[in-house]
Amino acid sequence: MNSLLMITACLFLIGTVWAKEGYLVNKSTGCKYGCLLLGKNEGCDKECKAKNQGGSYGYCYAFGCWCEGLPESTPTYPLPNKSCSKK
């Protein structure tokens, strides 16, 4: 029983350590989600935890929403072959 518990705990930690992180990106413009209040930011946290993003935590870093615990399928900035176009 203890072995099963240890294996489960290790798998959980591996998943947490290897989770993707990065700036949230707007797929249509290729730009980062912007923010002004650096550090703990309710807007960034909400965006990161949204169903379509799947992150575990978000905050404002260098005026962009940085997310942790993202699934590999969630795109992050910069997008390949797409530069930020502010139109």
Curated annotation (Swiss-Prot):
SUPFAM superfamilies: Scorpion toxin-like. Expressed by the venom gland. It is found in: Secreted. One of its GO terms (cellular component) is extracellular region. Residues 20-85 form the LCN-type CS-alpha/beta domain. The keyword Cytoplasm does not apply. Disulfide bonds join C31-C84, C35-C60, C44-C65, C48-C67. GO terms for biological process: defense response. Its main location: secreted. GO terms for molecular function: sodium channel inhibitor activity; toxin activity. InterPro entries: LCN-type_CS_alpha_beta_dom, Scorpion_toxin-like, Scorpion_toxin-like_sf, Scorpion_toxinL, Scorpion_toxinL/defensin. Gene3D superfamilies: Knottin, scorpion toxin-like. Keywords: Cleavage on pair of basic residues, Disulfide bond, Ion channel impairing toxin, Neurotoxin, Secreted, Signal, Toxin, Voltage-gated sodium channel impairing toxin. Residues 1-19 form the signal peptide. Beta toxins bind voltage-independently at site-4 of sodium channels (Nav) and shift the voltage of activation toward more negative potentials thereby affecting sodium channel activation and promoting spontaneous and repetitive firing. This toxin is lethal to crustaceans (freshwater crayfish (Cambarellus montezumae spp.)), it provokes a reversible paralysis to insects (crickets (Achaeta spp.)), but is not toxic to mice. At high concentrations, it does displace the (beta) mammal-specific toxin Cn2 from rat brain synaptosomes. Belongs to the long (4 C-C) scorpion toxin superfamily. Sodium channel inhibitor family. Beta subfamily. Has the structural arrangement of an alpha-helix connected to antiparallel beta-sheets by disulfide bonds (CS-alpha/beta). This is Beta-toxin Cn5. It comes from Centruroides noxius.
